[in-house]
């Protein structure tokens, strides 16, 4: 027993006073809060303002919305044109790729051009009337490009190529109107560099020689 008591370290006076000070005095009431067993939590690290966190969340949400808008853009299957809304895509398909719509516009019996805004139900006989309506009534910009036709570039290209084709036709007509000149040469006819007439016929060699002699005699006379 004495050896076990000697091995145990004795508490100092300050330690005993500290332990006794932590013991509550008197009776403990049921309403008294229990003594905390753990130390209060202390946040260690970099402090971030709540406004910065909200700003980053808003920026991330905006990027997500932009990506969704790009993925959900409306594309025409025929010409691959991108349009921002389903209504504009419907108008594009109807006006550019629908034969019934083109025939109805040529007849002109009823208005066929719908307004660019989906909420507006007014229709017009021509695209010009619709554009004026959207600029005046709905305050759309004057350089709104939705109603441009897809064949205008082709028409311009064809218009530019027409003068060239006419010039080629004129050159062909001029060459046809030129008189036929028969090619002949003095001496042995071994080589010919150019032949402007028709195909040579093998049965008229003597006639060509006789014509050449007559031409020489005319020159000497």
UniProtKB/Swiss-Prot annotation:
Q: Looking at the record, which segments are called Disordered?
A: 146-168
* Keyword line: Developmental protein, Metal-binding, Repeat, Zinc, Zinc-finger
Q: Which InterPro entries match?
A: ZNF511 (IPR039258), Znf_C2H2_type (IPR013087)
Q: Does the keyword Zinc apply?
A: yes
Known PROSITE patterns for this protein? ZINC_FINGER_C2H2_1
- Zn finger region (C2H2-type): 74-97, 113-138
Bias (Basic residues) occurs at 151-160
Q: Which GO terms describe its molecular function?
A: zinc ion binding
For this entry, the protein name equals Protein lethal(2)k10201
Function, as annotated:
Vital for development.
């Amino acid at each position: 027993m004495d050896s076990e008591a000697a091995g145990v370290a004795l508490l100092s006076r300050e330690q005993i006073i500290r332990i006794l000070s932590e013991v509550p005095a008197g009776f403990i009431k049921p309403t008294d809060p229990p003594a905390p067993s753990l130390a209060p939590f202390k946040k260690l690290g970099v402090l971030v303002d709540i406004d910065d966190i909200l700003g980053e969340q808003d920026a991330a949400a905006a990027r997500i919305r932009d990506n969704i808008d790009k993925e959900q853009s409306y594309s025409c299957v025929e010409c691959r044109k991108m349009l921002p809304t389903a209504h504009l895509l419907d108008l594009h398909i109807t006006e550019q790729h629908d034969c019934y719509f083109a025939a109805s516009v040529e007849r002109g019996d009823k208005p066929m051009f719908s307004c660019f805004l989906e909420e507006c139900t007014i229709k017009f006989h021509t695209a010009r009337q619709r554009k004026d309506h959207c600029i005046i009534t709905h305050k759309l910009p004057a350089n709104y490009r939705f109603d441009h036709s897809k064949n205008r570039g082709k028409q311009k290209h064809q218009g530019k190529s027409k003068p060239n084709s006419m010039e080629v036709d004129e050159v062909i007509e001029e060459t046809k109107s030129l008189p036929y000149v028969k090619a002949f040469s003095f001496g042995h006819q071994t080589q010919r560099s150019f032949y402007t007439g028709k195909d040579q016929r093998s049965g008229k060699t003597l006639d060509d020689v006789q014509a050449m002699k007559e031409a020489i005699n005319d020159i000497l006379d």
